[in-house]
């Protein structure tokens, strides 16, 4: 955030809310490249030619009446020799940085001190909440947040945050030129958009989800006698991790009549979301859950113009339903305990049944993911990673170790860790087969020559840490390791098996 203040003329642009002139500044594209999610803005070009491309792009934008160079410009590829989508990629990633500035300035220039709740940024911070709340609840519903049906909906969402009309028109023009503005949004289009420009996609999608949750929170506060103390939404982007307050009453209050608010006076309604999947859970009767379901459908249809079928939102009894959320299968199971009590001369035995959140590793989907990246076949039998055979022995072992430690780190909250032993076996044997293939040897011959050194490397991170804390207490170590451990430093699921 400090880099934005150092580069930008904040007083000038913040006073008038003019953002579009920044599209002509070279440092904007440098920031987009240095702080990009995948640094793909100038992929395949060296620094010298990259700077030349940016200068040429800015020069063409100055000379033309419109900002965006048309993808149908026949002379572009013929004269310059570049891919016709390269200019689109550069402008869109630079534009994403520009539109992020109003969000960033609210955090940097806030008069009140911002407390950086790093622990709440972790994905694992959701599970202690589920452990605490869900055993007392009865009904749950898995809800997929639908995409807006037209790109104009995303642009209209940004107008509450970005006051510069020229920037919004530029965004419309960009989407019209390069992403087939007139077509409906499908999952394939969103997938292509997210891959080609993840920064702009996250900005648009998060603003859409943020607005939806602002409405949800506002109506929840209006309808409940137990007002929420803190109000706000967490952004998925790491830069926007703080809770943000915004006057949604003026913007959204007219979209829904006050008569429907009395339906939702439930102090035990809980809402959890990660990315596009959310969970609604309640302690009350299924009738209230049904009312919440139709409320959400009306919210999407009336405000976001998204068609959604109520029949596709299922309400399940929590005691008989397993949640597929954040890579875990979570369910509520009874935990029986026998207590012997004695009063005067009489003793009696009581059975106490307590509900407990059970989190399991989805072993079959996990093996499927390993098979997709060629660590094993579809049946889970390890195979060699042929694309890594040209690397050094140290690099091969280090890559396998990082993958397993990341998986072990993330699934440390599992109630039953025996499933991880199979993943450990697959990765260990795949590593041995890769090394044997590199040295043109058999697995048995290679293991005889190597000994047990390779096997010693495949310890989980939890075992290493706990062995340092409890060097002599083997029973305590085993007890701690068999329990669940939630880490507060995991911010992204997609990088768990990033082996590059």
Curated annotation (Swiss-Prot):
A single cellular component GO annotation: chloroplast
Gene Ontology MF, one: RNA binding
Cellular localisation: Plastid, Chloroplast
Coiled-coil boundaries: none
Keywords from the named record: Chloroplast, mRNA processing, Plastid, RNA-binding, tRNA processing
InterPro entries with a match to the protein in the record: Domain_X, Maturase_MatK, Maturase_MatK_N
Any one Gene Ontology BP term: mRNA processing
Entry-linked Pfam families: Intron_maturas2, MatK_N
Family to which the UniProt record says this protein belongs: Belongs to the intron maturase 2 family. MatK subfamily.
Role noted for this protein: Usually encoded in the trnK tRNA gene intron. Probably assists in splicing its own and other chloroplast group II introns.
Name of the protein: Maturase K
Lineage start: Eukaryota, Viridiplantae, Streptophyta, Embryophyta, Tracheophyta
